[in-house]
Regions:
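Hydrophobic alpha-helical transmembrane segments of small proteolipidic membrane proteins, enriched
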Residues: 1-72
């Protein structure tokens, strides 16, 4: 196992911890908000999906960096 492989694993591990925690918190808070105000569920769901997409973009950046490290 080369140092490059360890760097790739580290980048993916660290780069996906933050988005995973953020997505979990977003979903939990959205479910709480829908539970408190069911009439606003469409607006809450739309905002939640948009926020999840932004959080997931960080994990995709980590994937791109790890692929660059792996193959370049």
């Amino acid at each position: 196992m080369e140092l490059k492989d360890i760097a790739v694993a580290f980048v993916m591990g660290v780069g996906t911890i933050g988005p995973a925690i953020a997505i979990g918190m977003l979903a939990g808070k959205a479910l709480e908000a829908i539970g408190r105000n069911p009439e606003a569920s469409n607006k809450i769901q739309t905002a939640m999906i948009l926020a999840i997409a932004f959080a997931e973009a960080i994990a995709i950046y980590a994937l791109v960096v790890s692929l660059i490290l792996k193959f370049v």
